[in-house]
Amino acid sequence: MPKRKDIQKIMVIGSGPIIIGQAAEFDYAGTQACLALKEEGYKVILVNSNPATIMTDKEIADKVYIEPLTLEFVNRIIRKERPDAILPTLGGQTGLNMAMALSKAGILDDLEIELLGTKLSAIDQAEDRDLFKQLMQELDQPIPESTIVKTVDEAVTFARDIGYPVIVRPAFTLGGTGGGICSSEEELCEITENGLKLSPVTQCLIERSIAGFKEIEYEVMRDSADNALVVCNMENFDPVGIHTGDSIVFAPTQTLSDIENQMLRDASLKIIRALKIEGGCNVQLALDPYSFKYYVIEVNPRVSRSSALASKATGYPIAKLAAKIAVGLTLDEMINPITGTTYAMFEPTLDYVVAKIPRFPFDKFEHGERQLGTQMKATGEVMAIGRNLEESLLKACRSLEIGVCHNEMTSLSNISDEELVTKVIKAQDDRLFYLSEAIRRGYSIEELESLTKIDLFFLDKLLHIVEIEQDLQMHVEHLESLKKAKRYGFSDQKIAEIWQKDESDIRAMRHSHSLYPVYKMVDTCAAEFDAKTPYFYSTYELENESVQSNKESILVLGSGPIRIGQGVEFDYATVHSVKAIQKAGYEAIIMNSNPETVSTDFSVSDKLYFEPLTFEDVMNVIDLEQPKGVIVQFGGQTAINLAQALSEAGVTILGTQVEDLDRAEDRDLFEKALKELGIPQPQGQTATNEEEALEAAKKIGFPVLVRPSYVLGGRAMEIVENKEDLREYIRTAVKASPEHPILVDSYIFGKECEVDAISDGKSVLIPGIMEHIERAGVHSGDSMAVYPPQQLSKQIQETIAEYTKRLAIGLNCIGMMNVQFVIKNDQVYVIEVNPRASRTVPFLSKVPGIPMAQIATKLILGQPLKDLGYEDGLYPQSQLVHIKAPVFSFTKLAQVDSLLGPEMKSTGEVMGSDTSLEKALYKAFEANNSHLSEFGQIVFTIADDSKAEALSLARRFKAIGYQIMATQGTAAYFAEQGLSACLVGKIGDAANDIPTLVRHGHVQAIVNTVGIKRTADKDGQMIRSSAIEQGVPLFTALDTAKAMLTVLESRCFNIEAI
């Protein structure tokens, strides 16, 4: 069927900020979709609130709106642009929910706008738990016994009838938000109450638990002519009961018989046809391990996290083809871009094994609830490809960047058998490592299977890895043992550990016996047809399919899995760097391990190596490709941490040199450089042990800011105000980076701002200064940033620009650099310098319109700044005001304290832009879902050192119609100053303590601060948790509350009696 000619203009709805459950996979899908629609000649209008994405670049769509994804703003854009159709299925749950909201508000009917791809009725049938149940019954597809409830009492009655455990699944939520497995009535009441609040339609499905069944996924596609195919089938290592986003997943399925595969395949195709889905769809099924009995768990009628994984696992571009199907093209008339000869109707075949392992944030949130269930907790994921399961699993383990190079954590060797068995049964994020430890201790795989319900096939593979370890122990420096270990994915580092050698010895031994990896192509057809893709993975076999070209090449290292502190912003910079390399006439090679991102789309670079970002794996690619050099600036700390070892191995690092990277990271060298350049910094010292740290703090004076060097995202950073706290910090946190000393700095409570700069070593371009709304003490990634600065004098801005230029030239910076400043009493101090791309690059690239990563890459490749048409110094400021606001995922992370501090906690960001600060702030708050009513009750519970400042805020809140409530100490202080506040009860005083008031909807906002001593009491954490659980706006920094107040005041009319 030819593409539709009756529509010209299509709006694509993006997925908004990155949160747990909805990450970079939608940037990848949205980018593909917009480009595919443009390729077909349609005019594309994109709306998304996330500036950190490739998708929101001007060239991706004809018009790009970075605006809040709320009905208010999307409606305005629709009325302005008048699109003929909207494509909502590539914007995750956000896109689908927006489509439903537009329909319910009558906007689509009113403006005669069509929804493309999946119809509203299909979205409703798949997402509405009741309609889905009816459809499955009509299709004769088995689903677990279940009921739809709108109250807690209904849930309790049903559970009493069918027995526990039961699963709660709220309707229209993402990543299992609000759901869970309940083993008792108490758990059921708690989870259902929360689930009903989080469901936009106040509806939960309560179903019989089928935990322990195998969890299987089918990624399917269908077009308007009813052609349908399975792109990829996947099997979860973990049985049903753990969210698929938190499970280790293998593709293709590993343990199914042909009969089982055909049965589930037929069911998936039957469902997509019945729903009349046009595009991509994900079907999740549960299979009884002991019979042919199965259940349909759920259907996602859209492109999803699994679609991104399936696309990267097979090379089949699901989102691109889904967009083309949405405008009428059919699978049998579209060419598969991988082979260039077969049609998209041809089902991919894999002759390799793909492993996906989730990346969790518990290295940052040590007190978070780590037990896994039906609510997703991972922030990102890694993928690895191998010729056998062991190889792909071990490559994925070392891609995680959690300090392991194997499926082994050495710290587990000290735990008791009792603790080991508990951790094996109660699945946490690190269960794989406990299982492997149990096998090393001699537990049988049959015992482990009965404890975990993980299939014996997978446990046998873990046993095989342990057997290879034992073989290596018995045959030190034995060539055949080395070959076998390499064939099954062992790293040089692990083999060196077992043989008690250096990693370099293993590398030398391999090379002396010509034992090199070969690179195989991902071609969708198991080599049945010639493929055109430059998409490769390594393995230890004979035939190498990756041929070095005659063109000079540059290798760009990606940033690995998305985690807190290192998000999609770095992928953005990587993709732009590749574009500049190609424009400069070089072959651009990317190496990365993240299946969610645009950088791992094979069409972005000239060659893509889907490999772990370790010294060994990077060197193997360098040995084959012999690039002119390697760029490490755009891959975050992941790539920077490899620079030293690569340089020592004789690799050319392009851009800022390793010794200069060291001068920025090494405290003593940095201090020396600042003195030479005449730039002030907070007084500070380095310390390598407890005595030195205490001595430094005594000399500097408390409070001090302590942190390890060479970390990203404020990892293990803390403000301490006495010796006891400092001793506690040294004992617990120095582990964060044991081979490097810790930094002890004077803590200056002033205004923070940051700058990104681009330098060729002689000239320095500063795209802009970003002023932080929150004062020092809140991590820059968690602060709201304003561009251009609103409260910095011209003189201070000139000083910042001057210091930045001095630093860039003094540190021989070639490419990018990020500098953070604190200002107190008109004195500008440098806090830190990062000689690489930072997380603000996408925001600052979009706002003044400077393609920062591309310019930086051109300078790295040797072009002078002046030849690119840019002047030295600060770039002219934008006429609009732009706000970058953080987005948090606390609702998914039980027991993680939402108190903001020097360690980063946000998972994503949004942007608000307008003609005034107040309007831009309003948009930013709307975009990050901090919607505050115009009046109501606000609770203040304030630390002594900020009560005076909080008083003036409380007075302003009262003036616009808010009723002030406060805890005992705060209320007493307010009363002394002439402001009466309603007293709230102590925690535990059930009638009117804050959690109770919050639960009953009597509180519209909470302002809660703690003193500089950040070990906040339990009561404070309970207050903050109750606000997060009930979705009540919570401010733990007075500056953020002040910003919100500014917005509310600007929207208030003055009402006075005459």
UniProtKB/Swiss-Prot annotation:
Q: Where is this region: Allosteric domain?
A: 930-1058
Cofactor binding annotation: Binds 4 Mg(2+) or Mn(2+) ions per subunit.
Write out the entry's keywords from A to Z: Amino-acid biosynthesis, Arginine biosynthesis, ATP-binding, Ligase, Magnesium, Manganese, Metal-binding, Nucleotide-binding, Pyrimidine biosynthesis, Repeat
Q: Example GO molecular function term?
A: ATP binding
Residues holding Mn(2+) 4: 832, 834
- For binding Mg(2+) 4, which residues are annotated in this chain's numbering? 832, 834
In which residues is ATP 1 bound?
Answer: 129, 169, 175-176, 208, 210, 215, 241-243, 284, 298
Q: Where along this sequence does the record place binding of ATP 2?
A: 707, 746, 748, 752, 777-780, 820, 832
* All residue ranges annotated as the ATP-grasp domain in the record: 133-327, 671-861
**What EC number(s) are associated with this protein in UniProt?**
6.3.4.16, 6.3.5.5
Q: Which Pfam families is this protein grouped with?
A: CPSase_L_D2 (PF02786), CPSase_L_D3 (PF02787), MGS (PF02142)
This chain's protein is named: Carbamoyl phosphate synthase large chain
Organism expressing this protein natively: Streptococcus pyogenes serotype M49 (strain NZ131)
